[in-house]
C-alpha cells in the first residue's frame, strides 16, 4: 500500500462545537445535515428546520443526484454537483463537515463524504457520532435556516473512485477487484426483502463478500477504531493492500466500507454507484445469488 497523508475523515462533536462557538462556520468551514429517511418514517427536511447544528445547511440527496437515471440516487454530473454545493456556500477551499440524524449515529453522511471526494474535494469530514451524539452531549442547536453566500466550486470527477455496471460485470471474469456488500446479511443472502422496494428481489452479486455497514459502528454510534476495523476486514479475508469495490443497494451504505477502509489507511476504495438496484435489473440472472424466491442458491 502506498503511504500518503490522508485528510482527517472524522471530526469529533467536541471539535465541531468549539468551531461553532468560535464563529468559524463560514466560507472556510461549512456544516451539512445530510439526513434522509425511508418514506413514511421521518421527514429529514422538517427535522432540519426544527433543529440542527448552528450554521448547518441541509444537503438534499434527492436534489443532488442524476434525476434522469432510472436507478436510485446516482451521482449527478460534475456541473450539477458544482452548482448544488456552490449554492450551499462551498468552494474548493472549504472544509466540509457532514452529519445525519440517523439513530445508528451515521447513515447517509458517508455517502456525501464520498461524493465530495469523488468530485475532487479533499477537505471533507464526517461528524463522528452524528447528530445523535451532538444532542446527547448537550451541544447547541437552532431552528434558524442557514443562508450562506453562494460560492464557486469546481468539480473534477475522480473516476478511480467510481465503478460502473460494465466494469463490475467485467470484474466477474478478471477478478481484479475484491467486491464487498454492505447490506444486512438477510438482504445479502436473499432471505429478507429489500425495504420499500417494488420489483426488487434481495440477493447479491456473485463473488461478493458481506460486511454489514452497521457493524462498523459502536452501540453508541461512533466509528470503531482502525484496529477494530482492520480486524473486521481480516476476518472476512478482505485484503486492504489490494483493489476493492464496495456495493450495497443503491450506493449509499457502501460508502461506509470506503470510510472504514480510509480510516485503515486505504483511500482508494471504489463505489459501484448503481449497486444491487441496477445489477438486479440489468445483469444476467446467473451473475447474482439469492436464497429467496426466484433466486439462485
From Swiss-Prot:
**Impact of altering residue 250 to A?**
No rhodanese activity
Name the positions where substrate binds: 187, 250
Give the protein's recorded name. Answer: Thiosulfate sulfurtransferase
Example GO molecular function:
3-mercaptopyruvate sulfurtransferase activity
- Source species of the chain: Bos taurus (Bovine)
Signal sequence coordinates: none
Q: In which tissues is it expressed?
A: Expressed in numerous tissues.
Per the UniProt entry, the glycosylated residues are 35
Q: Which reaction does it catalyse?
A: thiosulfate + hydrogen cyanide = thiocyanate + sulfite + 2 H(+)
